[in-house]
Curated annotation (Swiss-Prot):
It is found in: Cytoplasm. Its EC number is 2.4.2.7. Pathway: Purine metabolism; AMP biosynthesis via salvage pathway; AMP from adenine: step 1/1. GO terms for molecular function: adenine binding; adenine phosphoribosyltransferase activity; AMP binding. Keywords: Cytoplasm, Glycosyltransferase, Purine salvage, Transferase. This is Adenine phosphoribosyltransferase.
Length: 185
């Protein structure tokens, strides 16, 4: 990496370290939740994280940015704008009018689904970089990859702000590059 790349990522890591709010026992006992809302709400911190994510997405040859519902929308839109690319909003089931393409995936206690419009957006053959705030189990990102592939798009990699260690999230992402702005602590 160049000196510029290191300084971009260092600024983003510093912003994440300074502004992330930690909430013990949320959403359940034993979990330390990392709330990025203060990072997103601070212009300088938000810009630092977006700059690092945009640099990573550019290295992954992004042609379209895929943002996952909901914080991935915020980060993905900003990254797409910075790079002069379009953004693909990957929605939770039931949020888009038909017709849609749906991909179900397993949750700890049930199933969920992601959707894309089946009309109006042509992603066939395009390199799509998926962006979200957190990599945990990788279930949602893995489902997003399958959804895009079912529409003949190509996921060229993943860019995340943070990663929760010990949950095996990368195992669900297939053989694609994963770039995390702040390495697991």
């Amino acid at each position: 990496m160049s000196d510029q790349a290191l300084s971009t990522f260092d600024r983003a890591r510093e912003a994440l370290d300074k502004k992330t709010r930690y909430v013990q026992d949320f959403p359940e006992k034993g979990v330390l939740f990392e709330d990025l809302t203060p990072v997103l709400g601070d212009a300088e911190s938000f810009a630092a994280v977006v700059d690092a994510m945009a640099e990573a997405a550019e290295k992954l040859n992004a042609e379209i940015i895929g943002g996952l519902d909901a914080r991935g929308f915020l980060l993905g839109s900003a990254v797409a704008y910075k790079l002069g690319l379009g953004v693909l909003a990957i929605r939770k089931k039931g949020k888009l009018p038909p017709p849609v393409v749906t991909q179900e995936y397993e949750l700890e206690y049930g199933t969920a689904a992601l959707e894309l419009p089946s009309e109006g957006i042509d992603i066939a053959g395009k390199n799509i970089v998926l962006i979200d705030d957190v990599l945990a189990t990788g279930g949602t990102l893995g489902a997003a990859r399958k959804l895009i592939e079912s529409c003949d798009g190509h996921v060229s990699g993943y860019v995340l702000a943070i990663e929760v260690p010990g949950l095996g999230g990368r195992d669900n992402l297939g053989a694609r590059p994963v770039i995390v702005v702040r390495d697991p602590q």
